[in-house]
Amino acid sequence: MNILGIIFALLAGVFFGIIGPVTKTAYNLGAGIGLAIFLRYIIALIIVSPLIPNQQGLISTYKKHLGNFLLITLASIMLTTGLLISVTYINVSLTIIIFCTYPIIVLAISIFITKERIKNIIKFLFFTTFIGLFLALSPSTDDLKIQGIAFALLASFGAAIMIVTNQTMSKKNISAIHINIFINFFNTVFFFIMLSLFYKIDTNISINAFLILLIPSCSYAIALFLQLLAIPRIGQTNTALFLYLEPITGIFGAVLILNEKLTSIQLLGTAIVLISLAASTFVTKEIKNDFA
């Protein structure tokens, strides 16, 4: 049912949105970026591991569709590394604005490449949501650096490729659990090697910082799984649109957890996004499916 897919996509947006402000809280308590990345994937792998023995034909599925699995995993690496590096060059608000162009990229792919029939109202809601998001985040244009913009775009393309590839795989009846296992196993090994060679996984932190860092790690695992479940039900276009709830959740998290203040423009932008998402929910319920 469409309503179930909508719920999965919206919840994925909420859980993805939790990650930013809670992770920053852990950073403020002394946690490092390396540990945050490694925990994200190892916790997700631990959560999904009990399901592995019950997966029939797991290895044969990986062999048969290896290209798809490698592509979606590469996209997840683009997403993680792009966001991580971008914020070292430009401010967080601008990073999120650039990153959140990924639903527009998905929409373009849906229209021009996969040839989906997208209702004009859905196209309109995409752009009103993005405009609202731009106002809500109120980015500064000071000290723009091309490196930061490039890495934020890398993350955006990574997110878009993940969503589009996921839909392609769902049409081949590839389980969301199979995808989840592959991504998290591969990335656990990949980032452990990369961080060990070129960075540092600092475990010398307080117990409070460690426990708080577990929250975004678990949130990532839940959000990824919900996203993988949403796409086969409502399609890549609608899933991308509903994931706009992610930055709005991040804004509320920043206000509630980090005591940041919202300006009148940010409140207006937040209202536009929420109204657009509510309208999208209604429209999507009226449309059986956007994809063939």
Residue ranges and their predicted role:
Residues 48, 118-138, 191-192, 244, ...:
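Hydrophobic transmembrane alpha-helices of multi-pass small-molecule transport proteins
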Residues 20, 49, 55-93, 99, ...:
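Specific transmembrane alpha-helical segments of multi-pass solute transporters/efflux pumps
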Residues 3-8, 34-50, 125-128, 150-154, ...:
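Hydrophobic alpha-helical transmembrane segments of multi-pass integral membrane proteins
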Residues 1-35, 39, 141-168, 292:
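Glycine-/small-residue-enriched transmembrane alpha-helix faces in small-molecule transporters
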Residues 17, 21, 73, 77-81, ...:
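Hydrophobic/small/kink-forming positions within alpha-helical transmembrane segments
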Residues 47, 52, 83-85, 102-127, ...:
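C-terminal transmembrane-helix exit sites in multi-pass transporters
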Residues 39, 95-101, 166-187, 220-256:
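Helix-helix packing/entry segments at the starts of transmembrane helices
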Residues 26, 36, 40, 86, ...:
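Hydrophobic/aromatic residues within transmembrane alpha-helices
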